[in-house]
Amino acid sequence: MDENLLLSLIENNAKMEVVDLAAALNETEENVDKTIKDLEKNKTIYGYHTLINWDKTNHDVCTAVIQVNAKPERDYGYDRIAKKIYNFPEVDTMYLLAGNYEFLLIVKGKTMVEVAKFVNSRLAVIEGIERTATMYVLKQYKNTGKLVEDDNKDAAERLLV
């Protein structure tokens, strides 16, 4: 079975039924189901995610992208400081980077003030963190390969001259 194709299909549509996956892969349902279970067990598939346009709800969400400069620790590199950061519930996503900053965080809170308090009182005070740069998301156009639909798209296009 082409596991990469299976993973691509699931990544694109996690709700795709096993019968449809089997047909797309020209495999039996049993084989596809077993392969998915194996991929979940070995953590190749480590979760399923629903994309939500929070702007269409009455739930307040403020998303920030935070770049972090940190000093590596002897014998541990960045792993121990990363663990201190990623265990905060506000941290949605975290990457180790090559470039001007060591970490890139996606942080969520109810308001800009809540995110700022998190950065000021919990993140920036961690030993080894040298500097942070916080940017607030104003609008989301695309998330995980999917376009975020905008009801005002036509009106915005008409305004362009």
State where each predicted segment sits.
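A compositional/biophysical signature of low hydrophobicity enriched in polar/charged and small residues
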Residues: 1-161
